[in-house]
């Protein structure tokens, strides 16, 4: 689920109760207005949340600067638009008071409510996307990594967010670094995807090494651990005192975009020494950077997509081959650092265990069995990759599944594949994959015929794909008279449970006009009735009566559909008898 959809889960009002606020503190300095063609800066300044949400969903960088070197959050804070500020913060806008952009936002805040919002998000960063969250869980599942970061959280005097991580998140590392005698557990493919330095090392000098010991005393353990944590989570959290060490490590690891951002923040830190809060607060300060601040090609999904492309290119070489598992040699996978071979429909896919295990509980269990009992080796030589074989799905569907597992999205999809992928998402416990399929399918649905929309409505209801279900229900409700004229819509009614006639039995009770719609999946025809009442914008005192009229209309359509079905069966019987 995207951070935008999770916005309701952020409840900061309790944090504001202890503030003595005037009514004027809750009002923006300028009235809200719509800027349908505005950029992110204009939308933030105007308080146009709908336009801002659209821009964020299309991938606009929320930390981009305009020609006055200002970010969008600055304008939202300056104008007092708390909803716009909250939306930007939930999607990675920098708000730390110890950064250049965050400092400006704090000082420009129109009122205490805005400043309190910034403080709340500074103490508790927004939730990570599914890919980043899964890999972060894997990183913190390693006990040495978790112990160090828990110690850092205690030193930084922030709430404990790591206590829930334990053995259930553990997936064994394939490389261990020792810095000043202290270990960091990691996985080669993640480091290689994020850093050209690590990629070159793992392909050459460190190819067969499971432990790497750094002898340089100047190498900072906190800085290196924070950087590797960033490689997994796309979120950098580091003590301000360790930032200079991190710049040196970024230079060696060739993380140029991250290095430039940290260098700029260091300049700000040097010129911010006059700030009185440094004297008042003796606790260590931390710097937080979201991955969205980096160019898209340097973020985690793009980095893993490059690894995936190399792996898929090699899988095409083995297309529809009948050779034995013994042909999948380690040497074939050096470039992509693949460490498992998955065969689907006679095609070999070179994959990475840590990605599969982090994204799917099913693969975590399968790979754990392979590693513990050598299920995939079957007595083959030691230079062969572990081998898995998956059944009852096509190679095309598996390719789309691993594309999502590596990148958290799907660039495009054939509508004919959708049902199989929905089924695959359920079987492999990859439920967010359904949302990614829905996002890729929506452009196709814009040109779908009523008959096709009826099919999509039934399919989305069957697999619980709420986004497509809601989209189809909205279209049917707004064009109800056009749909009732189609044979496919009437035939669909025969396959669905009837609507709840008694209002006490309805899964979706008619709500007041303009009220927030429920997203819980209930009886499909009950929900269609609610959508229709909403589209008709009927007055509250007429809604129950109108709901009964709607139910009677559906009952008439069902009778027509049954008659049409009987006539069709009779004609088919005559044809077979002739």
From Swiss-Prot:
Asked whether the keyword Repeat is assigned, the reply is yes
Tell me the route in metabolism or biology where this protein functions: Protein modification; protein ubiquitination
- Report the superkingdom from the record: Eukaryota
Q: Where are the ANK repeats?
A: 35-64, 68-97
Ordered alphabetically, the record's keywords are: ANK repeat, Repeat, Ubl conjugation pathway
A Pfam family that the UniProt record links to this protein: Ank_4
Q: Which InterPro entries match?
A: ABTB1, Ankyrin_rpt, Ankyrin_rpt-contain_sf, BTB/POZ_dom, SKP1/BTB/POZ_sf
Q: Where is the BTB domain?
A: 173-240, 338-414
The GO biological-process annotations, alphabetized, read as: defense response to bacterium; innate immune response; protein ubiquitination; regulation of defense response
Task: Quote the record's domain comment.
Answer: The BTB/POZ domain mediates the interaction with some component of ubiquitin ligase complexes.
PANTHER family, sorted:
ANKYRIN REPEAT AND BTB/POZ DOMAIN-CONTAINING PROTEIN 1, ANKYRIN REPEAT AND BTB_POZ DOMAIN-CONTAINING PROTEIN 1
What does the record give as the function of this protein? Answer: May act as a substrate-specific adapter of an E3 ubiquitin-protein ligase complex (CUL3-RBX1-BTB) which mediates the ubiquitination and subsequent proteasomal degradation of target proteins.
The protein here is known as BTB/POZ domain-containing protein At2g04740
UniProt source species: Arabidopsis thaliana
């Amino acid at each position: 689920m995207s951070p935008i959809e999770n916005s309701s889960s952020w409840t900061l009002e309790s944090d504001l109760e202890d503030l003595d606020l005037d009514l004027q503190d809750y009002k923006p300095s300028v009235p809200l207005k719509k800027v349908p063609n505005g950029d992110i800066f204009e939308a933030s300044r105007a308080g146009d949340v709908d336009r801002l949400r659209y821009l964020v969903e299309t991938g606009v960088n929320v930390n981009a600067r305009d020609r006055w070197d200002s970010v969008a959050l600055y304008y939202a804070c300056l104008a007092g638009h708390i909803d716009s500020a909250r939306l930007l913060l939930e999607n990675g806008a920098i708000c730390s008071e110890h950064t250049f952009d965050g400092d400006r936002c704090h000082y420009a805040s129109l009122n205490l409510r805005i400043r309190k919002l910034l403080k709340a998000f500074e103490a508790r960063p927004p939730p990570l996307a599914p890919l980043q969250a899964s890999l972060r869980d894997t990183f913190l599942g390693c006990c040495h990594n978790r112990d160090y970061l828990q110690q850092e959280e205690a030193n930084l005097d922030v709430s404990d967010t790591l206590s829930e991580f334990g053995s259930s998140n553990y997936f064994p590392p394939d490389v261990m670094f020792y810095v000043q005698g202290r270990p960091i557990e990691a996985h080669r493919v993640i480091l290689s995807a994020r850093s050209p330095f690590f990629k070159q090392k793992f392909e050459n000098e460190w190819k067969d090494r499971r432990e790497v010991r750094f002898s340089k005393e100047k190498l900072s353990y906190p800085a290196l651990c924070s950087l590797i944590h960033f490689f997994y989570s796309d979120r950098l959290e580091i003590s301000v005192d360790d930032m200079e060490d991190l710049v040196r490590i970024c230079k060696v690891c060739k993380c140029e975009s991250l290095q430039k951002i940290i260098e700029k923040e260091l300049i700000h830190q040097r010129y911010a020494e006059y700030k009185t809060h440094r004297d008042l607060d003796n606790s260590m300060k931390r710097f937080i950077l979201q991955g969205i601040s980096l160019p898209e090609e340097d973020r985690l999904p793009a980095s893993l997509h490059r690894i995936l492309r190399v792996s898929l290119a090699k899988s095409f070489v083995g297309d529809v081959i009948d050779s034995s598992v013994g042909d999948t040699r380690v040497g074939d996978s050096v470039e992509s650092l693949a460490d498992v071979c998955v065969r689907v429909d006679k095609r070999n896919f070179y994959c990475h265990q840590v990605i599969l295990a982090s994204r799917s509980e099913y693969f975590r269990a399968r790979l754990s069995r392979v590693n513990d009992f050598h299920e995939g080796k079957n007595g083959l030589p030691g230079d062969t990759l572990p081998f898995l074989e998956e059944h009852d799905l096509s190679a095309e569907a598996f390719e789309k599944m691993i594309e999502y597992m590596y990148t958290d999205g799907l660039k495009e999809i054939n509508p004919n594949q959708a049902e199989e992928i929905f089924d695959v998402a359920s079987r492999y416990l990859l439920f967010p994959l359904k949302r990614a399929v829905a996002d890729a399918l929506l452009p196709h649905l814009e040109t779908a015929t009523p008959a096709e929309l009826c099919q999509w409505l039934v399919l989305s209801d069957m697999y619980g794909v709420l986004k497509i279900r809601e989209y189809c229900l909205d279209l049917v409700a707004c064009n109800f008279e056009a749909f009732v004229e189609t044979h496919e819509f009437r035939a669909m009614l025969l396959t669905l449970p009837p609507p709840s006639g008694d209002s006490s039995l309805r899964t979706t009770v008619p709500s007041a006009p303009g009220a927030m719609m429920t997203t819980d999946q209930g009886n499909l025809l009950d929900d269609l009735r609610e959508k229709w009442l909403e589209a008709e914008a009927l007055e509250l005192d007429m809604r129950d009566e109108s709901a009964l009229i709607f139910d009677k209309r559906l009952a008439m359509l069902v009778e027509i559909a049954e008659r049409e079905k009987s006539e069709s069966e009779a004609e088919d019987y005559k044809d077979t008898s002739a």
